[in-house]
Amino acid sequence: DADGTHLLPLGRKLRGLASRPNQFDGNVIDWRSGDGWVLMSRDFVPEADATGSNIRGTGSRDGLGVELVDTVTGKAQLVERPDSEATDYLADGQGNIRIKEVMPRDGTGLLTGETIYRYHPTGGGGGGWQPFSRARANSHDALEPLAVDGTRDVAFATRGLNGRLALYSVKLDGSMATELVASNPEVDVTSVVTIGRRGRVIGATYVTDRRQTDYFDPDYRKLAAALARALPRTPLIRFVGANADESQLLVFAGSDVDPGTYYRFTKATRRLDALVGARPALGGVAMGEMKAVRFPAADGTMVPAYLTLPPGGAARGLPAIVMPHGGPSYRDEWGFDWLVQFFAASGYAVIQPQYRGSSGYGDGWFANNAFRSWEQAISDV
């Protein structure tokens, strides 16, 4: 309920006879029209005594499928049969599953290193899944879909362009007509911005020293600029959600020294009301500023990094912590980081190198995720 009572878990729980472990109990892929039903992708785990049998029902189903789930009762209807090689599904915000991601295995059960994308063309027509693209591991030659916008009947997908990931729109009417919609000459375009229950795509994001957003929707472009002027100390502004008609928006604003606050913005009155802080216990606590820097590697290559110094303290003679990010396919970015701030508050300078092998800087820097070039990546650290 709205007051937080009568919680109903929607995930699929494992039974006692499950044949394998499962760390994923479901993900909402389409919120539909607000009728109380949602589309959820769910990992079906067969029962140990049903494997290979002809037992009917859910006990022998295996793999990722999609169910239509009643959020009031928890009852579910199967709408996409489980596939043991499926890894993701994308819906169009109008209750339709449009794209399926599959990672096939060879005869020994090992992944082939290929990802296959299929789609349902507009209107279906009973033809089943149609080819969308085939992508090879650590290659950006193929279209890799991120989202589907049902209001325009297009998928948004990334593909390599001049050594960087760019964003394209792809018509789902069967023509697969493709159009470039966003790119950056220095870094990869990494994600799209969606709004509302239907997941309408309104922009694309990429990270230079800070995360940037190119808004396709002119109204949201103007609104984002207005919010940036109204909240100059928290420039990391993003639209988190909206009500059905987008008359009220949930907005987040933060920075490197501010964990952030969630606001409700009412379009009719242009009123911005603070709702809750992301980390209220840190209110009034001094934070160290995060600065984008460059330093020369052993071979002279300039490596991007972030440097955070203790707040209000000396800038020289400090003990330092070098904190490389994890992976695979990852990078740090400017903004609040609780672990960095913990070390800075303890008197350390914190350096976060974006070593060769980090994602987001293009194919040349990614270097196949430092595969067979780990010595170079480690030397950058």
Place the predicted regions along the sequence by residue:
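Residues at the C-termini of beta-strands that transition into short coil/loop
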Residues: 11, 205, 276-279, 354
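Flexible loop/turn segments at secondary-structure boundaries
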Residues: 86, 139, 163-166, 188-190, ...
